[in-house]
C-alpha cells in the first residue's frame, strides 16, 4: 500500500492524493487527515476522514484545507493514512500509518500558494496511541521495533528449540530408564534364584 500523486490545488483549496492497495487481498478501511506545519509548529489540522479501498485498486483522497489565514512562508503539508489493526506486534494488533509530505510557499498577504517541492519517500509509522494529538512516532522507533521483534522471534525460536531438545532428552531418559529398569529387575530375579 502506498501514497502517490500528492498535490495541493490552491484554486480549490484541496489536497489530493491517490492510495493504492496492490498486495492485500482484503478490503482495507483507512482513515486519513492532514497537518500543515512550519518548523515544529502545527498551524492547521484537518478533520479525520474515512474510506475503504478494495484489493488491487486505487482511490483518490481529497482533503479540503483552509489556509487563507497563514502568513507568508514555506509550509509543509503532511498527509497521514492510517490502517487500524494492520500488523501484529507482541501479540497485539497495531495500526500502521503512512505519511507523505509536500512543501508549499505562501506569497504575500494575498495568500497565493505554490507547490514548492514534493518529498518522494513514503514513511511508515508504527502507532499504538489512539489520540489524534499523538499520531506520529519517529521512524527510528519503527526500526527499533523491528530490531526488538527480530530479537523476540530469535529468542522464541531458541526457547522452542531448547524445549524440543529437553523433551527429546527426557524421552530418551525415560526410554533408557525403562530399559535399565527392565534389565535391573531381570538381574535381581536371577540373583534371588541363585543367591
Swiss-Prot record:
GO cellular component, one term: membrane
Top-rank taxon: Archaea
Primary location group: membrane
Membrane association type: Single-pass membrane protein
Name of the protein: Uncharacterized protein MJ0904
Swiss-Prot/TrEMBL keywords: Membrane, Transmembrane, Transmembrane helix
Subcellular location, record wording: Membrane
Transmembrane feature ranges: 175-195
Keyword Transmembrane: yes
Amino acid at each position: 500500500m502506498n501514497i502517490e500523486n500528492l498535490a495541493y490545488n490552491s484554486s480549490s483549496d484541496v489536497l489530493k492524493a491517490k492510495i493504492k492497495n496492490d498486495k492485500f487481498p482484503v478490503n482495507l478501511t483507512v482513515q486519513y487527515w492532514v497537518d500543515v506545519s512550519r518548523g515544529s509548529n502545527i498551524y492547521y489540522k484537518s478533520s479525520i476522514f474515512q474510506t475503504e479501498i478494495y484489493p488491487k485498486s486505487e482511490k483518490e483522497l481529497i482533503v479540503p484545507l483552509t489556509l487563507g489565514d497563514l502568513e507568508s512562508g514555506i509550509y509543509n503539508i503532511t498527509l497521514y493514512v492510517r490502517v487500524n489493526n494492520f500488523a501484529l506486534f507482541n501479540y497485539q494488533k497495531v495500526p500502521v500509518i503512512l505519511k507523505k509530505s509536500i512543501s508549499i510557499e505562501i506569497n504575500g498577504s494575498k495568500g497565493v500558494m505554490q507547490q514548492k517541492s514534493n518529498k518522494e519517500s513514503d514513511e511508515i509509522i508504527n502507532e499504538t496511541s489512539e489520540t489524534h494529538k499523538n499520531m506520529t512516532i519517529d521512524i527510528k522507533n519503527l526500526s527499533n521495533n523491528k530490531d526488538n521483534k527480530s530479537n523476540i522471534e530469535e529468542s522464541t525460536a531458541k526457547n522452542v528449540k531448547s524445549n524440543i531438545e529437553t523433551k527429546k532428552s527426557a524421552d530418551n531418559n525415560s526410554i533408557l530408564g525403562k530399559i535399565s529398569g527392565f534389565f535391573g529387575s531381570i538381574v535381581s530375579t536371577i540373583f534371588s534364584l541363585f543367591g
